[in-house]
Curated annotation (Swiss-Prot):
Residues 50-59, 88-98, 128-137, 152-166, 194-209, 282-310 have a biased composition (Basic and acidic residues). Its main location: nucleus. Residues 1-219, 231-310 are annotated as: Disordered. It comes from the Eukaryota. One of its GO terms (cellular component) is spliceosomal complex. The keyword Nucleus applies. This is Pre-mRNA-splicing factor SPP2. Belongs to the SPP2 family. Associated with the spliceosome. It is found in: Nucleus. Involved in spliceosome maturation and the first step of pre-mRNA splicing. Signal peptide: none annotated.
Length: 347
């Protein structure tokens, strides 16, 4: 360590901002200039992605993914109404007919392929030999051609005697009748329930529509599903039926039956018909007015009676003073006025 020069082994570390280059970078072909860094220097290579963007520009990220470039843009193309094609109704009768035909075809194929031992009858218990036509033909084949009388005699010999009623009853009890022995009874094989269910599942699987994909679900909004079904069935898109009443929320502090004033309030227009239309009278007011009218009528009647008596008395006094038995027309007019009569009495 002592052999080495201590000046060469030193490491110099300097803190500070990067120095500006002596020569500015030339302008690019696109006409953009290199923008200075916020701290005074030029932007580094790691910040080349943000070059060309203003420092005060705000960006909002709305979509993240592969299709982010086209999702936020408005294509401007008019969207066609969505339509779901109508599927044909299921024909139960034809399905049942086809299922029946398939079952009958399978049974017929099973009958055509006979098992090996089907022609041989099962034997058990006491077995009796049956005289068949083959033994008769073999015996007669060696003799050659026989006469007609001999053949008739052989047929008569081979013919069985007629059975009596007792013998037929005995055979019926013992269940040994020949028609039952010769009869071949066949019981069709019953298909298992599992085979039927499997065939039905295969048929439904073949007739089922294609499975919807995720793209189909994304293209069909939930609120448009019912309208799309109706369009597939022939709906023209026009609403039918009675129009529903649009319920609107009332403004604040507006009661039932009140109407919103669209213009300014006209205070003078509130009582335009107030002079001609008065409020109905109350019972107390009506009774008070009726009493006043009655009082006026009674008072007027009493005054008129008094005035009439006064006029008669004044007329009698005047006639006595004048010496006349009947007043003239002018005097009658004067008698009608009480004040004039009083003045005459004073005179």
């Amino acid at each position: 360590m002592s052999d080495k020069d201590p000046a060469n082994s030193r490491i110099a570390i300097k803190f500070g901002a990067s120095k500006a280059p002596l020569r500015p970078s030339p302008a690019s072909a696109l006409g953009k200039r290199a923008r200075p860094h916020l701290l005074g220097g030029n932007a580094s290579d790691s910040e080349s992605d943000g070059e060309g963007r203003p420092a005060d520009r705000a960006e909002n990220i709305t979509t993240i993914g592969a299709g982010a470039d086209g999702r936020g843009r408005d294509t401007g193309s008019s969207k066609k109404p969505l339509t779901i094609p109508r599927q044909a109704n299921r024909d139960w009768k034809s399905e049942k007919r086809a299922r029946t035909n398939t079952t009958s075809t399978r049974q017929q194929a099973d009958k055509e392929v006979e098992p090996v031992d089907q022609g041989k009858p099962l034997k058990w218990g006491l077995t009796l030999k049956e005289k068949g036509a083959k033994a008769t033909e073999d015996a007669g084949g060696q003799a050659g051609e026989a006469s007609t009388d001999q053949s008739d005699a052989d047929k008569g010999a081979d013919a069985k005697p007629e059975k009596t009623a007792d013998e037929e009853a005995m055979e019926a009890l013992l269940d040994e009748r020949e028609d039952k022995k010769k009869r071949n009874l066949v019981i069709a094989r019953a298909e298992s329930a599992g085979a039927k269910e499997e065939e039905a599942f295969k048929q439904n699987f073949r007739d089922a529509p294609d499975v919807s994909t995720l793209e189909d679900y994304e293209e069909m909004p939930v609120e448009e599903f019912g309208a799309a079904l109706l369009r597939g069935m022939g709906w023209d898109g026009k609403p039918r039926g009675p129009k529903t009443k649009d319920v609107k929320r009332r403004p604040n502090q507006m009661g039932l039956g009140a109407k919103d004033l669209k213009g300014q309030e006209d205070l003078g227009a509130w009582d335009q018909k107030g002079s001609s239309r008065s409020r109905p009278k109350r019972l107390n007011d009506y009774k008070r007015e009726e009493r006043e009218r009655q009082d006026k009528r009674s008072h007027r009647g009493s005054e008129s009676y008094k005035q009439e008596r006064d006029r008669e008395r004044y007329a009698a006094v005047y006639l006595g003073l004048c010496g006349r038995s009947r007043p003239s027309t002018g005097h009658r007019f004067m008698y009608g006025n009480a004040k004039i009569s009083r003045q005459l009495m004073k005179d």
